[in-house]
Amino acid sequence: MFDDQQAPQLRLFVISDSIGETAQRMIHATLTQFPDISQIEIKKYPFIKNEEELMHILNRAKELNAVVVTTLVNPDFNIAGQHLAKKLQIPYIDYMSDLIGIIQQQTQCNPILESGALRKLDENYFKRIEAMEYAVKYDDGKHFTDIGEADALIVGVSRTSKTPLSMYLANKGYKIANIPLVLEVDIPDEVFKHKHLKVFGLTASPDYILNIRNERVKILGLSGPSNYNSMDRIREELIHAEEVFEKLNATVINTEYKSIEESAFYIEKCL
């Protein structure tokens, strides 16, 4: 970002008792407002363990005329850093303590003062992304190779909310596979190999499913009778579904007039 032969226009020291990602993001967001600054040096000092280490870094910042940016959650580190920065007369920006103090004052809630809490949130974020990718891959019986990795398997006839429920749970970090139950298609042997799989069977009354399928047919602009929205066919499918539920030892959930959130809440309790 800068020429070794020339002093940078701006030096920034990023100090944190965690990885320091929060401060780096704030710095990069701020620097976008200064496109004319071409020579910038950013030095990172993550995982600060003691005040002596902090003091050494601040003295070095004084020597190099650097701006210090911190996300120190440990209040003792913060106080020590602020005092020395004031004594050394160096710019010291503390992203965490002011906002923590204001939120504490407004809510009367005490902060956990845990370093790396944001990183844990990031880990949860990536877990959700992985779960979403899994749910898409294993939606509607598309794949079975790694179905044993699923936190839950959802099975049911068409229009019992298998996909919406899978995606909702995936957004909460659960790996969900779902398989449609069709009269002419057997459940793959691969599914029966994984005895640990928690299986949930979705069902509803024939009238309820018929109404939903009729609406689906209208949306698709189709006309004329078909097996898809035939009451006799739906009854056969539901009888077949009950047999499959028993074979898979599935927990049965009636989704009739039930929100996705309600069904998901029940599944979460079972996981």
From Swiss-Prot:
Q: Which UniProt keywords apply?
A: Kinase, Nucleotide-binding, Serine/threonine-protein kinase, Transferase
> Could you say which EC number(s) this protein's record lists?
2.7.11.32, 2.7.4.27
Residue spans making up a coiled coil are none
Intrachain disulfide bonds: none
Report residues binding ADP. Answer: 156-163
Gene Ontology molecular function: ADP binding; ATP binding; phosphotransferase activity, phosphate group as acceptor; protein serine/threonine kinase activity
**Domain of life of the native organism:** Bacteria
The reply on keyword Transferase is: yes
Catalyzed reactions per annotation: N(tele)-phospho-L-histidyl/L-threonyl-[pyruvate, phosphate dikinase] + ADP = N(tele)-phospho-L-histidyl/O-phospho-L-threonyl-[pyruvate, phosphate dikinase] + AMP + H(+); N(tele)-phospho-L-histidyl/O-phospho-L-threonyl-[pyruvate, phosphate dikinase] + phosphate + H(+) = N(tele)-phospho-L-histidyl/L-threonyl-[pyruvate, phosphate dikinase] + diphosphate
Query: What NCBIfam families does UniProt report for this protein, alphabetically?
Result: PRK05339.1
What family classification does the UniProt entry report for this protein? Belongs to the pyruvate, phosphate/water dikinase regulatory protein family. PDRP subfamily.
* Record-linked HAMAP family: PDRP
What function does the entry list?
A: Bifunctional serine/threonine kinase and phosphorylase involved in the regulation of the pyruvate, phosphate dikinase (PPDK) by catalyzing its phosphorylation/dephosphorylation.
> What's the protein name?
Putative pyruvate, phosphate dikinase regulatory protein 1
